[in-house]
Amino acid sequence: MARIVIVDYGMGNLASVRNALRAVGFEAAVSDDPAAVAGADGLVLPGVGAFGTGMQNLARRGLDQAVRQAAAAGRPVLGICLGMQLLLAEGDEGGPRPGLGLLEGRVARLPDGLPLPQIGWNLVEPQRDHPLFAGLPTPFWAYFDHAYAVEGEPPSTALALTDYGRTYPSVVGRGNLLGIQFHPEKSSRAGLRMLANWGRMVCDLISTRPST
């Protein structure tokens, strides 16, 4: 069975993510132990709150390096909401701050003129085929709760786009790294399907590892 770990850095709806994974057949442990995080078969980095505080909490517990270590080892890493933003190079919430630097991109506040944070359902437009989107319609609806998003021209890692005041990547990814700006655990069937797809990706990767 895949060892999926939900990273506990004091910012996230951990139980709801774990329950959603369980609903689609995958058990996950919640841990703030860097060794458990670095040694997981798959990592979920959830998060609700401010970019700077998130990075501080990760660093204080040694979890920033543990996530980087897991990513460098090719373990699947899934960032959700703030967790997705922390995977990127930089965020400007509370002033420019470096992120984990695992994916390109900078996080900036969404433009004024619409209610912020964006809370509720919005369309997600996949831009290319990806196993994460298997079985989903194009576009599909998902549940958002955020005031910051990737800014500028969509980077090469953009897998899906959403419009709210401006068009921004709502799903990003490269190799074993994936980030979702919305909350799949709150996004009904589409969100559960994405979590199931990601869980299968973790299991498929385990099955291809050489035996030791």
Curated annotation (Swiss-Prot):
Q: Which Pfam families match?
A: GATase
Q: Which CDD domains match?
A: GATase1_IGP_Synthase (cd01748)
Q: InterPro entries attached here? A: Class_I_gatase-like, GATASE, Imidazole-glycPsynth_HisH
Q: Which reaction does it catalyse?
A: 5-[(5-phospho-1-deoxy-D-ribulos-1-ylimino)methylamino]-1-(5-phospho-beta-D-ribosyl)imidazole-4-carboxamide + L-glutamine = D-erythro-1-(imidazol-4-yl)glycerol 3-phosphate + 5-amino-1-(5-phospho-beta-D-ribosyl)imidazole-4-carboxamide + L-glutamate + H(+); L-glutamine + H2O = L-glutamate + NH4(+)
The protein's UniProt keywords, in alphabetical order, are: Amino-acid biosynthesis, Cytoplasm, Glutamine amidotransferase, Histidine biosynthesis, Hydrolase, Lyase
The pathway where this protein functions is: Amino-acid biosynthesis; L-histidine biosynthesis; L-histidine from 5-phospho-alpha-D-ribose 1-diphosphate: step 5/9
Q: Report the record's Gene Ontology biological process terms.
A: L-histidine biosynthetic process
What EC number(s) is this enzyme filed under?
4.3.2.10, 3.5.1.2
Q: Which residues form the active site?
A: 81 (nucleophile), 183, 185
- Enumerate the spans annotated as Glutamine amidotransferase type-1 domain: 3-208
Q: Which GO terms describe its cellular component?
A: cytoplasm
Q: Where in the cell is it found?
A: Cytoplasm
- Its principal location? cytoplasm
Primary role: IGPS catalyzes the conversion of PRFAR and glutamine to IGP, AICAR and glutamate. The HisH subunit catalyzes the hydrolysis of glutamine to glutamate and ammonia as part of the synthesis of IGP and AICAR. The resulting ammonia molecule is channeled to the active site of HisF.
* HAMAP family, per the entry: HisH
Instruction: Relate the assembly described in the record.
Output: Heterodimer of HisH and HisF.
Q: Do you know which NCBIfam families this protein is assigned to?
A: IMP_synth_hisH
Q: What is this protein called?
A: Imidazole glycerol phosphate synthase subunit HisH
Lineage at the top is: Bacteria, Bacillati, Bacillota, Clostridia, Eubacteriales
